[in-house]
């Protein structure tokens, strides 16, 4: 089982999202994804998990909700890098 490491940017993003439109469901939406990541299970197809390229090469992205993305990297730990909408994360 992997451990979770949260970047400072992720912590800031999580705080923002927990006060925004996803506040009622954020924890419930994140829990199954994080459980799958730490236990090395593949994510359900609905999360649209895929590799990133460019500045984010080596990272993966999944859709927690249609307009809420999680950028992460798996190695010995699961590093949560960013959380937010596509426009917030990619400009």
Which functions belong to the PLM regions below?
Residues 1-66, 74-78, 88-91:
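Basic, Lys/Arg-enriched alpha-helical interface segments
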């Amino acid at each position: 089982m992997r451990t979770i490491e949260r970047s400072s940017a992720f912590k800031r993003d999580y705080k923002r999202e927990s006060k925004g439109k996803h506040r009622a469901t954020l924890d419930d939406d994140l829990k199954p994804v994080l459980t799958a990541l730490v236990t090395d299970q593949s994510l359900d197809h609905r999360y649209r998990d895929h590799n990133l390229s460019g500045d984010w090469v080596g990272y993966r992205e999944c859709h927690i909700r249609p307009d809420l993305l999680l950028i992460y990297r798996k190695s010995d730990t699961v590093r949560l890098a960013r959380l937010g909408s596509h426009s917030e994360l990619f400009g």
